[in-house]
Amino acid sequence: MTDDPAATPRPETSVNARPAFSGQAPIKAEYLINTTPIVESASASELNNIHPDDAAEGRTDSRDSRDGRDRPDNKRRKPNKQDKKDKKGQNKGRHFPVIREASVRICRAWETTGICDRADKGDCRYAHSWEGYFEVKPNDISYRPDWSLVGEAPFVVEGERVVGGEDVVGKTLDLDTVCPVLKDLGYCPFGWRCRFLGAHVKRVAAAVDGEKEKEAGPEKRMGEWQVENWVQSEVENGWKQKETNWPEHEVLNALRRSTASFPFSEAYLKKVDPDKPFTLQNKKPTKQQPHKRKNNVLDEEEAANGPTGIPSAGDDEENAMNATENERNEEKGKVYGEPEAIDVPLRPEEKRRLNWEGGRYLAPLTTVGNLPFRRLCVDYGATITVSEMALAQPLVYGAKEEWALVRRHESEKMFGVQVAGGFPNRMVPAAEVIANTIGKGGGVDFVDVNMGCPIDLVFNQGAGSALMDSPGRLGKLLVGMNRALGDIPLTVKFRTGVAHGKPNAHKLIPRFVTEWGAGALTIHGRSRQQRYSKPADWEYIKTCVTALRESVADANLPPVPIFGNGDCFSAASYYEEMDRSGVDGVMVARGALIKPWIFTEIKERREWDISAVERLEGIKKFAEFGLSHWGSDTQGVNTTRRFLCEALSFQHRYIPIGLLERLPAKLNERPPAYRGRNELETLLASPFAGDWVKISEMFLGKVDEGFSFVPKHKSNAYGGEEAQG
């Protein structure tokens, strides 16, 4: 590499100019690309035909608009510390606007029932007719699941679009398309708004003026077209659209208005903190504040214990709850000692047993661990899944965006809800409302407490890994949740400790089981301070396993499963880590994000040299699952596209094992510039967001105007100027 910017391309726009560094993946020489600058455009397509001999001819314009050459003084400024920092890390404060049809906004009440009470009063601002809607509605997305996928461009061998006709409705239709929602559910609740409408309409004789009377219900006929299989799904026995955990509207309204009752939480918190009044008052109950997770779609670094406009735990509460056990009055802080007290933990036989030995456990993953992704992992062989991290305070305040995170698909046979929070006066009510709503219908098999989140905004509020340094507060929190959940097991996920070199997990583990009643444990083999920068410490995990086994035996308790977590990236490493540490299983996190098929490898105890076409099949499944979950209208398609790009922002880091000189691959190794064994494999390895959008277009149609995508981790964004920021 040279210091001359004319010869060294910008790292964020050149795949083939990455310098060699420790931790570089050993790729076979025939797949390597010469590090001499050759590619400046943000696309992987130019890499397919590049050979080392082309290096001298490949560069057409070496000027960098940011190298300072165009300034009057023609002086080049050396990059400072901030410049270097800006080129790496995370894109924070990402914003994803909601993209709907650029057309007449149809009243949802009228659309689904044919009636709008507000329209009769003249105060509904939405349209109550489909007139004008199809004049601007985008054409159907052409999609058939039986289309062939191939390794060379165009990658998807599509059929011809079959247009419905020249009329205003027919010209938007593709009569040969397949609606993924209809395919999955047997009906489509999106009716005329479906972007795959041609799959569920039929041509009927045009009605003569005055011949057709208005039928009750939604309008199912437009000119010579009639929509079929349009069903407005309702919650039946807790299930809707093959998903469960739909709290009743009355329950959410009561939570928002602070009229819901928490009898157990009130009694328990009065017991452990008699001087502190129990209150869950939402200061703005009449107008629910927009949830930050909705507006900015929070990633881990933006999650806090309270949404915008809703008060979080105050300084007085934090000071009181953070007080050490020695500072507490013994009678006030004592949790155990009275057999009849409400805060005595349930006996082990009163809780459901978690028989997890050998289970294939997918970690809770904020943003990317959504329901369609979990469904994909289950399809590959995962047997234990957990929701994205839900924040206790928004759950207690009835934020619908937070409750959407706990949704469960019918394919998830062992499913838990992970809750984060720092204080008993939020976590115990959250456990109580979970038990009384989704817990009664079998919607949750266990509740997991997040004690591992390392990010500052969570840690500084006493939640996540901060709980490990506050055992007094932690004990009250866990015991209260355990009692509130009834027979639903409570599990904990934690790190080795807060500070590097000062682990304390082994001291807490005996108390987790014998005092606080945890039904299963998961330990991430890094401290909060380490984040993900160092390899997981499996020797320390072994120490923790020994501490658990001894404490369980001494207390004469039934076996309690313990899982390890950290750096699992292959079947070989999975079983090696299990044998070395003695854990009952290994929770897979980043490894599943990069290669969701790792669960197939673990199940079959093999290393899978998965082909590019097989990987594309998995991407197609994710798109189908996403449309079933988020919807097949324009808004649902764009939401699916956004989360598909999120998934590809991790999956592009996978290096095919057929290209490696040694196995198994290591999670933290990064590849030098390389090309795949075919065009598709090269495309799937692209770090450019524009290429991820191109991949999404294979199954979700052309991107809509206004769509932009900013990767969670810095890379080339796709979209307008705001996206580039």
From Swiss-Prot:
Its EC number is 1.3.1.89, 1.3.1.-. FMN binds at residues 364-366, 418, 493, 524, 565-567, 589-590. It is an enzyme of class 1 (oxidoreductase). It catalyses: 5,6-dihydrouridine(47) in tRNA + NAD(+) = uridine(47) in tRNA + NADH + H(+); 5,6-dihydrouridine(47) in tRNA + NADP(+) = uridine(47) in tRNA + NADPH + H(+); a 5,6-dihydrouridine in mRNA + NAD(+) = a uridine in mRNA + NADH + H(+); a 5,6-dihydrouridine in mRNA + NADP(+) = a uridine in mRNA + NADPH + H(+). Residues 51-73, 80-89, 325-337 have a biased composition (Basic and acidic residues). GO terms for molecular function: flavin adenine dinucleotide binding; mRNA dihydrouridine synthase activity; tRNA dihydrouridine synthase activity; tRNA-dihydrouridine47 synthase activity; zinc ion binding. Residues 1-26, 43-95, 275-339 are annotated as: Disordered. One of its GO terms (biological process) is mRNA processing. The active site is at 453 (proton donor). It is found in: Cytoplasm; Nucleus. InterPro entries: Aldolase_TIM, DUS-like_FMN-bd, tRNA_hU_synthase_CS, Znf_CCCH. One of its GO terms (cellular component) is nuclear periphery. It comes from the Eukaryota. A zinc finger (C3H1-type) spans 101-131, 178-203. Catalyzes the synthesis of dihydrouridine, a modified base found in the D-loop of most tRNAs. Specifically modifies U47 in cytoplasmic tRNAs. Catalyzes the synthesis of dihydrouridine in some mRNAs, thereby affecting their translation. Belongs to the Dus family. Dus3 subfamily. This is tRNA-dihydrouridine(47) synthase [NAD(P)(+)]. It comes from Cryptococcus neoformans var. neoformans serotype D (strain JEC21 / ATCC MYA-565) (Filobasidiella neoformans). The lineage of its organism: Eukaryota, Fungi, Dikarya, Basidiomycota, Agaricomycotina. The gene is DUS3.
